[in-house]
């Protein structure tokens, strides 16, 4: 087995759909095609949005399509890991609401990230003090970002990417949790400790990458490589949602669609099949180059044929 370690990281906030399946397929094939390892991680820290039964359903859907993995983790069982990592970071509690942050800067243009000016830097001695000051709201942890902090990396699919984090984001949020059990901190720590060598995910998460790289560096580690691939969208160009019909993998299975039909269509959208031919996932191992994947979003028109 090579030293490559990839990961599949679904969240139980909803059912897996075609877009998830395409990204996971690329991630899985990147690992298996070089004899690498696949880590499965359930990212279940967003408890208010978690759907009952969604975690088990995600495992069932992926197994049905032909996925397998070598290690399995659940983030909600790893709070002590995140707490220990948080203690090593230059982080502080912040009580500013989104409205506070927005009003502290000139009006951002659509799509721009919010810049945080450091209002709560040095303001509170502890999380508990901050929590008392903003009750019943919950504070968040922010990472202190020194002036002149720019992150540059080469994405395996999207190419060179650069962001001056100190000027565009400022001290960015890590987690809204006393133990640091939130997305930015948790995924970064887990990727490091699980030995993930490349993160393959949707290109909507490309802007989330520079903060994660900074967290990794503050923890004294080199970050993994990254590969951000286009999403599957509806005919209106917007990411898949109920307005585009039922694109849940479970719904296709219930309707009698075979896993080979789905994998074949996904392979066709990646340029790995010349036609929308039913295909087993395992048969794509070793014939899944990134170079044939279009750089535009994939449009789902409602049919696998």
Task: Name what the model sees in each region.
Residues 1-112, 203-204, 208-221:
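N-terminal Rossmann-like or analogous alpha/beta NTP/dinucleotide-binding catalytic cores
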Residues 34-36, 66-70, 169-172, 215-216, ...:
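Short, surface-exposed, polar/charged, turn-prone segments marking secondary-structure boundaries
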Residues 43, 74, 96-98, 228, ...:
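Proline- and acidic/polar-enriched loop/turn elements at helix boundaries
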Residues 55, 79, 98-101, 113, ...:
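Alpha-helix initiation and N-capping motif
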Residues 100-241, 248-253, 301-304:
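Active-site cores that bind ATP or allylic diphosphates and position pyrophosphate for catalysis
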Residues 60, 84, 88, 103, ...:
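Charged/polar, solvent-exposed surface patches and flexible loops
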Residues 1-15, 38, 65, 128-138, ...:
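Non-catalytic terminal extensions that flank enzyme cores
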Residues 89, 111-114, 244, 280:
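Short alpha-helix boundary/capping motifs
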